[in-house]
C-alpha cells in the first residue's frame, strides 16, 4: 500500500474539472508499471497537475504486470482519489513485456491521441504541453521526446552509461537512418490511429519495440516532430535494463537492419 503521507497529499489535491466538450482533443496516457509503488503516486500527481493547469482533457491508463510490491493496490487508491474516469487500471496477471503492454493499453484508450512514457519519473509530465503544441504546429503524426537535440539531456547517469547510450544511438542512426534523433527513447505522443497501425506492423518485444516503432513510422511515411527533453534516472526502485535487455537490443537492431 502507498504511504499514509503520500495518500494524504494526493487526497488533498483538487479533482480536475469535468464536463469538457466531447469534440475536444483527448489524450490517453499509457503507463506500464512493474514494481513502481513508490513512483506511481508522484507521476500521477504530476500528470494530473500538468493536464489540469493546461486545461487538457485526459485519462491515465495504468497497465500493471502483476507487480509483487503492491503497485496494483496503489493504482486502485489513485483511481478512488482522482476518479475512475481519469485513472483506469487495466492490469495483467504477469510480466509480459513493454510492447504487449502498449497493445493492451490502447484497447482501452478513448482519446484521439496517445502518450507513452515511463512511470519511474524519468520522463517529467511538464513536457507534455510542449509535445501537444509541437503536434499542432506541424500537424505531426508522432512527436518524440529527444535527449540528443537542442537543450535535451540525461541526468543521473554515470559516464559509462552515457557513453553506452550515445554509442547505441549513434549505431542505430547509421544502420537504420530513422529520421529521428533519439530512436531508443520512450516518451512520445501519437495519433491514436497511427499508433494502432504501427503496433500491427511491429514484431519486436521489450525495449526494441520503441526502436521499431520509429523505423516503421519512417517506412509508412508518417511525420515525426521532436521536442528536447531532460531524462532523469529513476530515484526509487531498480532499473529494468539488464544484460538480457542489452542482448535483445543488439539482436533487434540487426533484425531491423536486415528487414527494413
Swiss-Prot record:
Q: What protein family does this chain belong to?
A: Belongs to the glycosyltransferase 2 family.
Carrying N-acetylalanine, the residues are: 2
| Record: residues binding Mn(2+) | 120
EC?
2.4.1.83
Query: Localized where?
Result: Endoplasmic reticulum
Q: What reaction(s) does this enzyme catalyze?
A: a di-trans,poly-cis-dolichyl phosphate + GDP-alpha-D-mannose = a di-trans,poly-cis-dolichyl beta-D-mannosyl phosphate + GDP
The residues listed in the UniProt record as binding Mg(2+), with positions renumbered to this chain, are: 120
**Any GO molecular function:** D-mannose binding
What organism does the record attribute this protein to? Mus musculus (Mouse)
Output this protein's name.
Answer: Dolichol-phosphate mannosyltransferase subunit 1
Amino acid at each position: 500500500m502507498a504511504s499514509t503521507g503520500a495518500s494524504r497529499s494526493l487526497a488533498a489535491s483538487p479533482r480536475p474539472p469535468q464536463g469538457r466538450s466531447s469534440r475536444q482533443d483527448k489524450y490517453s496516457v499509457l503507463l506500464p508499471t512493474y514494481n513502481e509503488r513508490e513512483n506511481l503516486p508522484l507521476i500521477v500527481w504530476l500528470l494530473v497537475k500538468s493536464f489540469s493547469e493546461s486545461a487538457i482533457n485526459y485519462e491515465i491508463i495504468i497497465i500493471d504486470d502483476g507487480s509483487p510490491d503492491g503497485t496494483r493496490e496503489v493504482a486502485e487508491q489513485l483511481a478512488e482519489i482522482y476518479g475512475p474516469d481519469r485513472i483506469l487500471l487495466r492490469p495483467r496477471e504477469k510480466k509480459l513485456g513493454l510492447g504487449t503492454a502498449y497493445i493492451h493499453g490502447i484497447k482501452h484508450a478513448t482519446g484521439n491521441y496517445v502518450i507513452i512514457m515511463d512511470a519511474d519519473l524519468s520522463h517529467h509530465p511538464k513536457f507534455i504541453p510542449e509535445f501537444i503544441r509541437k503536434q499542432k504546429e506541424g500537424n505531426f503524426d508522432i512527436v518524440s521526446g529527444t535527449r540528443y537535440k537542442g537543450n535535451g539531456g540525461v541526468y543521473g547517469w554515470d559516464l559509462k552509461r552515457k557513453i553506452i547510450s550515445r554509442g547505441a544511438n549513434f549505431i542505430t542512426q547509421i544502420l537504420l537512418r530513422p529520421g529521428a534523433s533519439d530512436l531508443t527513447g520512450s516518451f512520445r505522443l501519437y495519433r491514436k490511429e497511427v499508433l494502432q497501425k504501427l503496433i500491427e506492423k511491429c514484431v519486436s518485444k521489450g525495449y526494441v519495440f520503441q526502436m521499431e516503432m520509429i523505423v516503421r513510422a519512417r517506412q509508412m511515411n508518417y511525420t515525426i516532430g521532436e521536442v528536447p527533453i531532460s531524462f532523469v534516472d529513476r530515484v526509487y526502485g531498480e532499473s529494468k535494463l539488464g544484460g538480457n535487455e542489452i542482448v535483445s537490443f543488439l539482436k533487434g537492431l540487426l533484425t531491423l537492419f536486415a528487414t527494413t
